[in-house]
């Protein structure tokens, strides 16, 4: 199906482009979302008449998105989840969780704006892209931790798993020293 794009669509084209897409994509996504019109003579004439108005509206929404991106860029949000000692989450952090964390931080972010390649399944700091407009995106950091204390440690740049491994190594060293002392005391007694 041939459609006229009413706004920039990622991996498809710019506003005003006439592109060929699959019928289902056009009927189920582009047309209902108001992102495109069927490419027929009447719609092409209608688009040409409204083109200046659509470009002005697009420019206005882009400026609003750029202002929001400037505020949102580099922000850090904490998400508390239960996890194993190895740092694997017992669930995952999804775009919905990231959007809720940003909303709790005072920003208006919808889950559809959060771009995750895959759900987050480990403790730590994770960079997440927020697409505020087809041409504007911001990067936020999601700090996934078991508690607020662990979140503060991770924010300082330390890894919870690394600290736990160091504590285990120190404990094993102390146990080895105790056994050495006990062994030395036993050989002194003989």
Swiss-Prot record:
Key word RNA-binding present: yes
Top-level taxonomic group: Bacteria
UniProt key word Lyase: no
PROSITE patterns: RIBOSOMAL_L9 (PS00651)
Gene Ontology CC entries for this record: ribonucleoprotein complex; ribosome
GO molecular function, one term: structural constituent of ribosome
GO biological process, one term: translation
Reported function: Binds to the 23S rRNA.
Sequence similarity: Belongs to the bacterial ribosomal protein bL9 family.
NCBIfam families found in the cross-reference section: L9 (TIGR00158)
UniProt-recorded name of the protein: Large ribosomal subunit protein bL9
